[in-house]
């Protein structure tokens, strides 16, 4: 029997993230797990001809990063449709469309990504030379016969609450049956019209999740299974390049996304450890008591659910109904979920929501939800069936006062936060909202740490690198003003790295198995482009992985 390690990394600064914050020089992996940490010369002496040896050459190593709210599947989907990035004018956009027409079959749909620069598609149409959106009449000049649809932004990429705009040419409107008599299905949608009352092809939606492409323009089609499969492959590559080795998908995962994960896993291609949460489609549930359904579902989502160290489904997403009619319309596209990847009808009215959460508590089904607005409902369920030790999850935590922090602590909730939104993109806006006297309530990382509440950092897919949230937790700088938002809530670099590693493992109820470089844990790590403990503060956001390893296998290596 071979006793030598499968992999040895030595001559580096290994930031172990163990309880003592140890910095080691080396480690060894065998059969997918760390078998030794420290003592580089002795480890090298144990190597044989089959051992992979990585000379770190002084570089920093961290445990594989764990994204606490990743929406991993979306990243690769951005490449399904042609990009309009770099288009600075309507003429630039028309040139792109014209080129697509030349390579398309007559009458074939031409569907593109939104106008603007990914990932946020910010400052449009002000960023175009004409300071306006193109219309059907513009698009008709280069595509009179092929239907054209420019997709809207997924609102959570931007978070500035400006309308989501999509644009169709005349042929697309004809196929969709949209004319001067068409009325928007909900008040949140505006069908822009010209002076004669005809639609201009421009749709504006005052919402964060598009409705038009799932209703009025459903004829454009959507992501296929192959799109999702290829997109997931590409997403994994992108996230690995930043050192991420695990994701937690707490917003819920619909069957069409789960199918892509399962197929990659069955083929041995899934290299991202993926903890998924069940997304229920309540409109499809039989007319039986909710508790009865939860009893049935418990067999596969209770406790740690079903799966292995690479793919697992456990827990259920719960949320109170908001904008019920809008979500009903989105859900009418079932089983298609678009960018969401979760069911649009996974919300419930308050009384049924509490009933569902009580049934979850009694069946040991972990509840995952979003924002502080859910706290009264969680507390109502807790009064009926205690949840203190069940590690329910509260994601997207943003503004929290001391009383709310205490309530979260007392319920034993685990949290994740998206500093990309609450600090970087919207910090100054939140500061205006709450006032300087309450600044420390904005993503209060230091207070949460001091209260003993676990906080997992998350990207929400904008952008994909967890080093952006790490930097934002440390520096807390607003993108637009450069102001430091609530400086008293800054945390140390080591604390932020813990939020991006071991606290993410705690979120997935797997801290005994991953999240730090310790003997017996899964052999996941990333060799970094610079040392996160000593690089210039503003360089934290630009850190990347030079090598990423999952279970002792290299899954990413920087090529140039």
What would you call each of these model-derived segments?
Residues 357-370, 374-392, 396-398, 402-409, ...:
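His/Asp/Glu-enriched, well-ordered alpha-helical/loop segment
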Residues 403-404, 556-558:
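Short acidic, Gly/Pro-enriched loop/turn segments at secondary-structure junctions
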